[in-house]
Structures are given as C-alpha cells and as structure tokens.
Amino acid sequence: SLQLLPDYFFHHDALKQKKMLGCYSLMLGFDEPLDLDWDAAQLTGTDISWIAVNSSKPGRPDDYSLLVHSTNEWAEEHLDDDVDAVKAYLCSQVAEIIGQNVYSAHHIDLHRWRYANIPKQDNNTLFIDSESKLAACGDWCKKGRIEEAFRSGFDLAKEMNNILLD
C-alpha cells in the first residue's frame, strides 16, 4: 500500500513501520497415512511452527498429506537459501518432531512466502485519511492472514459507509 499512496497520506509514517515476515510452506504427500494421533500441532522451540494433516480437512482429497509451516523467524534468516536445502532441512525437522520417516513422501513441494505474516500489531485494522480521501487496509494491518484481509476490508467498508452517511 505504501508504494501506492502519496507521501502526504496522513498515515504514511505508520505504514512505513509495517514489516511483513516470511514463511516457508512444505507440502508432503504420502501413499499411506502416517501414524499420528492428531490432525494439527502448533509448535514452539523449533524452526517449525505448524504441522497439519491437510487431508483431514473437510472437502480435501483422500490422499494423505501434511502441511508444514516454518517459523517466521527461521524463514526470515533463510529466505534466499537454496530451495532443495530448505526442503531437506524442513523434512529433517518434521521427521525429528513426529518421529517418523517423511522421506518416503511421493510428493514434496515447497512454497516461499516472502510476505506471509506480520508481528503482533495494535488494533488498527485500517488507515483512513479523510483530508486526502484515501484509505489503506489489508492483512498486513493485523496478522498477515487471509481472514484479516477480509476483516480489514469489511472494517474499511463499514467506516467509509459511516463517513459517507454523516
């Protein structure tokens, strides 16, 4: 948003303070289910922040798959690393965490999200400059998740409606 808005935008300095963080998503597809007694795990103290049995979600194909997210901190340090090295490292971490062989996966895919998340923010989900008649909103205002993009857009629409009706 900052690149689209003029320097005189009232919230220009606040927007300059926003910094998106990276994340790696690793998808592992297996011929047979792994022996896990959970569908999702949020982790601390490791370079992996999230592991989910993606195939357990409603409406997903029956093929057994795991979705793995790195921590933002680890990703930030390794955003420009070789993709194969990142895959190998994350696979080794997953294998260590779940105590099972993940190298038998028939599908291994990695996606690098340069702008995946944002550090915890205040409650400001949108930025309106009524003087210049400009506004900014997005996932980057709150938490860097798709839900926050919708909430931020919804909040902006409500606020604009209030302004226009006054």
Regions found by a protein language model. Give the residues of each.
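Short, solvent-exposed beta-alpha or beta-beta edge segments that form flexible loop/patches at the rim
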Residues: 47-56
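A conserved FAD-binding loop/helix module that cradles the flavin
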Residues: 128, 133, 138-165
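Central helical "cap/lid" subdomain
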Residues: 1-38, 100-103
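Short, glycine-/small-residue-rich phosphate/pyrophosphate-handling segment
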Residues: 35-47
